Curated annotation (Swiss-Prot):
Residues 1-380 form the FMN hydroxy acid dehydrogenase domain. It comes from Salmonella newport (strain SL254). It is an enzyme of class 1 (oxidoreductase). This is L-lactate dehydrogenase. Gene3D superfamilies: Aldolase class I. It is a peripheral membrane protein. One of its GO terms (biological process) is lactate metabolic process. One of its GO terms (molecular function) is FMN binding. InterPro entries: Aldolase_TIM, Alpha-hydoxy_acid_DH_FMN, FMN-dep_DH, FMN_HAD, FMN_hydac_DH_AS, LldD. HAMAP family: L_lact_dehydr.
Length: 396
């Protein structure tokens, strides 16, 4: 199979993975309107082509939180990553480390903090949810700090799980889910051998370490559903700061007022994100939300963005809309499921090449030169910058 883009990895992952795993990462909330808009809105962002700009010394290096990234990309936290490839978190972290970008370990990873951190040179980031069990949260923060994690990604857009209809149909949840997953695994022998058998244990490593007992997929569904905390408030950031003195990024911001509050409560960064369209269907795409948020807090706090990013051109678009760096989620998981560490490494190489092409043809020699000036502004006045659909004349 020829791999030239993230879409090729998606097609390959769909063949490789049991349906319950493919649709768990591929799907979104409710009717998946926001999931689609994340990609569609970003694809409508039009860039200004510039020529004769002498682009011989182009650089993608990006400073962030006292680190220097080789390009403005980090791997996002993805739950159950180790179910998509054998010890998947370790493989993905190795690919990110080799590329010179951060890897973010999810609270609900298969591989625990202590297994992943020693395998890479670059300090990884750690993601944490607000949960009813504050003992678990404190334990996770202390373990992340002891393992040398540099940055905390605090996910705040899950006070309750989103309703994901695909999961009930695919076997991740719903009637007879365990039996359906078993038969799906039998019908996908490559995954069953490589991950199902040789990727064990399939514990939720960070939770097992705290509870002192093995935790499987059913525990993941039950324990998390009962532990998300709807009482979450900005005051929780003050509690977090008692146990974490490093950079803290608030993930799940879609409104400028919330972005201002993040600044006011001492966050070091925000992630403009709708959780990949997996939480509340019908909210703004990240691309639509980003310009107003950047107008409100640019320069006061680091702005990261995710949701809908599938290639290097999308990275440039997000930065032009106001992001400093992006998080890559689904795209890297497709690559991981297809070819493990090598797949993620190849995807990151593709993204780097695509970014260089986009920057060369827009006349931006560095990441700092990508801005609103890189956008075509006259596509329409009624929608946020550069997000109005083109007319028939424009499309020509």
């Amino acid at each position: 199979m020829i791999i030239s883009a993230a879409s090729d990895y998606r097609a390959a992952a769909q063949r490789t993975l049991p349906p319950f795993l493919f649709h768990y990462i591929d799907g979104g909330a409710y009717a998946e309107y926001t999931l689609r808009r994340n990609v569609e809105d970003l694809s409508q962002v039009a860039l200004r082509q510039r020529v004769l700009k002498n682009m011989s010394d182009l650089s993608l290096e990006t400073p962030l939180f006292n680190e220097t990234l080789s390009m403005p990309v980090a791997l996002a936290p993805v739950g159950l990553c180790g179910m998509y490839a054998r010890r998947g978190e370790v493989q993905a972290a190795a690919a990110a480390d080799a590329k010179g970008i951060p890897f973010t370990l999810s609270t609900v990873s298969v591989c625990p903090i202590e297994e992943v951190a020693p395998t890479i040179k670059r300090p990884m980031w750690f993601q944490l949810y607000v949960l009813r069990d504050r003992g678990f949260m404190r334990n996770a923060l202390e373990r992340a700090k002891a393992a040398g994690c540099s940055t905390l990604v605090f996910t705040v857009d899950m006070p309750t799980p989103g309703a994901r209809y695909r999961d009930a149909h695919s076997g991740m949840s719903g009637p007879n889910a365990a039996m359906r997953r078993y038969w799906q695994a039998v019908m996908h022998p490559k995954w069953a051998w490589d991950v199902g058998l040789n990727g064990r244990p399939h514990d939720l490593g960070n939770i097992s370490a705290y509870l002192g007992k093995p935790t499987g997929l059913e525990d993941y569904i039950g324990w998390l559903a009962n532990n998300f905390d709807p009482s979450i408030s900005w005051k929780d950031l003050e509690w977090i700061r008692e146990f974490w003195d490093g950079p803290m990024v608030i993930k799940g911001i879609l409104d400028p007022e919330d972005a201002r509050d993040a600044v006011r409560f001492g966050a070091d960064g925000i992630v403009v994100s709708n959780h990949g369209g997996r939480q509340l269907d019908g909210v703004l795409s990240s691309a639509r939300a980003l310009p107003a948020i950047a107008d409100a807090v640019k320069g006061d706090i680091a702005i990261l963005a995710d949701s809908g990013i599938r290639n290097g051109l999308d990275v440039v678009r997000m930065i032009a809309l106001g992001a400093d760096t992006v998080l890559l989620g689904r795209a890297y998981l497709y690559a991981l499921a297809t070819a493990g560490k090598a797949g993620v490494a190849n995807l990151l190489d593709l993204i780097e090449k695509e970014m260089k092409v986009a920057m060369t043809l827009t006349g931006a020699k560095s990441i700092s030169e990508i801005s609103g000036d890189s956008l075509v502004q006259e596509l329409g006045k009624s929608l946020p910058t550069a997000l109005a659909p083109m007319s028939k004349g424009d499309a020509a």
